[in-house]
Amino acid sequence: MKKEFLDLYMILSVLAGVIGIFYLTTPYQDRPDKSLSYYMTLSVVTGILALIYLQNHHKKN
């Protein structure tokens, strides 16, 4: 995988994490699809890991 693709993937992961955070901050009753909670939690975790990766990656350059 080329570095540019990896960077793009990481940025998309961060965006997914942001969406996940918005989803998880809405009250449980108001959520459009309760089965998405698991995936949204996963996307938040992935987003945080992606942010850490991007910060470490750009320090080296």
Swiss-Prot record:
Give compartment(s).
Membrane
Give the way it sits in the membrane.
Multi-pass membrane protein
Q: Which UniProt keywords apply?
A: Membrane, Transmembrane, Transmembrane helix
Q: Where does the UniProt entry say this protein principally localizes? A: membrane
Q: Is Transmembrane helix there in the keyword field?
A: yes
Where are its TM segments located? Answer: 5-25, 35-55
Q: Which domain of life is it from?
A: Viruses
- GO CC annotations? membrane
Specify the protein name.
Transmembrane protein 300R
The organism encoding this protein is Invertebrate iridescent virus 6
